[in-house]
């Protein structure tokens, strides 16, 4: 299987890409999410490879792959995964190549400088049939926070898997910008009828942020994956990283303690119902 460098060249014809970037003029991702929702299920070409009912899934804020040992850690626990949700991924780091299997890459750009491009990166053993990028903005810093939305055909099923990789707005005193970023996903969740995974660094460092996320997920019938022992990275005593699922059940779930990032990775095995 060939590795697709989606940040370097256009995707093949089998991959329908809808690139959507909000602007700093106060627009939210709502309109972009509506456009993406309308494209769900529209690409009928068979993708390269199909995902199975049982999936090994990783979610990790890799802190720009800037710390010693990240590649060794990722190689050690990345074997056998079908989906990886990476936040603060750097295009200058060989993240996909570090995982010991060929993976397709779907990148949504976040903070970018002349020397480094970072964002959220979704890796998969199957080529996505749809890829949309949504962008929110940090209200104080004016920097982007990305969400990558991918859709995957499933082996032996008509329905498809919707995978949402989010790095949530962080530096905001109120909830307005955070709420807009989260609620924009409702358009997609209303339209999509198959299984769903939402994973990422949701920056739920306050009770009000966590309550907002919990209420939103409950509204669209998503449930949180529980971790015991819960070794997830915290701020102000609250876990920042989450995995929510719909139309799936959790078989195993663990948090791996690392020193190669300021976030501990989440590794789960999920079964599509």
What are these regions (language model features)?
Residues 2-100, 112-117, 183, 273:
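N-terminal, active-site-proximal structural segment of metallo-dependent hydrolase catalytic domains
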Residues 41, 53, 117-119, 146-148, ...:
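Residues that flank catalytic or metal-binding motifs in active/ligand-binding sites
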Residues 132-140, 166-176:
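Surface-exposed cleft-lining segments at the edges of enzyme active sites
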Residues 156, 161-170:
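Active-site-proximal loop/helix segment associated with metal-binding centers of metalloenzymes
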Residues 176-187:
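Alpha-helical scaffold elements lining the catalytic groove of polysaccharide deacetylases
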